[in-house]
Amino acid sequence: MESFEKLEKLLSYSFKNKELLIEALSHPSLRQHHEYKDDKDYERLEFLGDAVLNLVITEILFRNFANYNEGNLAKIRSYLVCKETICMVGAKLTLKNYIIMTHGEEVAGGRDNLNNIENATEALIAAIYLDSNIETTHDIIENLWAEFIKVQNLTDYDPKTALQEWAQASDHHLPIYRLIKREGASHSSTFTVLVKVKDYEQTGTGHTIKEAEKNAARSLLHRLKND
């Protein structure tokens, strides 16, 4: 696990209460392990962080997209707070290197588990909020999400349509979507879909196949614009 100082530099924020930072990065698996005395993990902070993130992103969109109606703002917000975007922010922070987890969780692939990265990212937002104030948290979120907010000129329409139009304009075959994984119980499944256009491919997850396809298309569009 890397030094928290590196993470604080990436955030441009130094925690006054380091215990909050540790709690935000503590995986729930620690509670079942006898070597760890503290029963705190990131689950409660993740709950708060989800709400803080939604509030801040909503305010940013309301302020910066004055000509967009409620429906378009909701579509953009949905993209900015979806698992894929949150995990891309977590990847920018190399957050997987800082999550504190049991050896068993790590061996099982816990550092690359998107749920863990998403939850820790949201918990980190809550920890910053509790350690500082809403204004500081707002500035940090706006900085971390800046590149994704700029992309939002393309989200007036469905990302699957946008990807199809890109493929046609580039003389490629139409995108092909393939379900590659289904996890969880039938009433709370998570689907993973792979989308492929020529030699480009990307995955997306969602609670429905349709949502997973949209998220895969969004991720691939984001990649294409940065290549």
UniProtKB/Swiss-Prot annotation:
The keyword tRNA processing is annotated on this UniProt entry: yes
Which enzyme class?
hydrolase
Residue spans crossing the bilayer = none
Q: Which reaction does it catalyse?
A: Endonucleolytic cleavage to 5'-phosphomonoester
Cysteines paired by S-S bonds = none
**Domain DRBM, which positions?**
158-226
Q: Which family does it belong to?
A: Belongs to the ribonuclease III family.
Its predominant location is cytoplasm
Q: Indicate what this protein is called per its UniProt record.
A: Ribonuclease 3
Instruction: Cite the SMART domains for this sequence.
Output: DSRM, RIBOc
- What is one process in the GO biological process aspect for this record? rRNA processing
Among the GO molecular function terms of this UniProt record, one is: metal ion binding
* Complex formation: Homodimer.
Q: Which organism is it from?
A: Rickettsia conorii (strain ATCC VR-613 / Malish 7)
> So what does this one do?
Digests double-stranded RNA. Involved in the processing of primary rRNA transcript to yield the immediate precursors to the large and small rRNAs (23S and 16S). Processes some mRNAs, and tRNAs when they are encoded in the rRNA operon. Processes pre-crRNA and tracrRNA of type II CRISPR loci if present in the organism.
- State the coiled-coil residue ranges: none
Documented EC number(s): 3.1.26.3
- Residues of the active site: 50, 122
Q: Where in the cell is it found?
A: Cytoplasm
Pfam families according to UniProt: dsrm, Ribonucleas_3_3
The record's Gene Ontology cellular component field reads: cytoplasm
Q: Which UniProt keywords apply?
A: Cytoplasm, Endonuclease, Hydrolase, Magnesium, Metal-binding, mRNA processing, Nuclease, RNA-binding, rRNA processing, rRNA-binding, tRNA processing
Q: Which residues bind Mg(2+)?
A: 46, 119, 122
Q: Which domain of life is it from?
A: Bacteria
> What are the required cofactors?
Mg(2+)
The record places domain RNase III at 4-133
